Amino acid sequence: MSTYVPIQTITLGSNSATVDFTGIPQTFTDFVLVGNFTTNQSAPFRLLVGNNTIDTAANYSMTQMAGTGSVTESTRSSNANFIASGYINAAGRSIWQMHFMNYANTTTNKTVLIRYSTDVSASQSANARVGLWRSTSAINCIRLETNASPQVFESGSTFTLYGIGSGSPKAFGGDRVVTDGTYWYHVFTSSGRFEPVTNLSC
């Protein structure tokens, strides 16, 4: 069973053309970035990643599939300086999810799955993209940036990073069972049964 562990949330207190996450822990198998945001201008936005510094070289590629229920399309870009992460419509709120797989691995190139939708009635669509960073370096920093001035992510937009750890708890029981990526915590709000499923040491 995989577990989502909140790492960091950024809520914009003012308009910004970039959103940066740095010092991403290397203790998870994957991580997921969820964005819930608005913009002042309908335009694409970009994803860049790196190890200690953001890579702005032509080391990215992207494949997209999209559909509205009546129309479908696909596009591809390669040898780009960023991953084109989708089109933001200024008329509504956008919900984005980016899933970075094996991000701490140092032997393979890095893949990210991007899914998003908009709540604009005139252009409702579902979109999926696959991005590739051609580097075997681990990812410990990421950047979202708007396409060009004067486009910005608007104040109040939120971006949350979750780590995904593999594994499962070594016991059953508790009203809530949570993990910080290293340890499991069984919370009892009343009396209950704690039942280990393996030998435990203390």
What annotation goes with each model-predicted range?
Residues 197-202:
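Extended Gly/Ser/Thr-rich low-complexity repeat segments
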Residues 1-193:
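Surface-exposed molecular-recognition determinants
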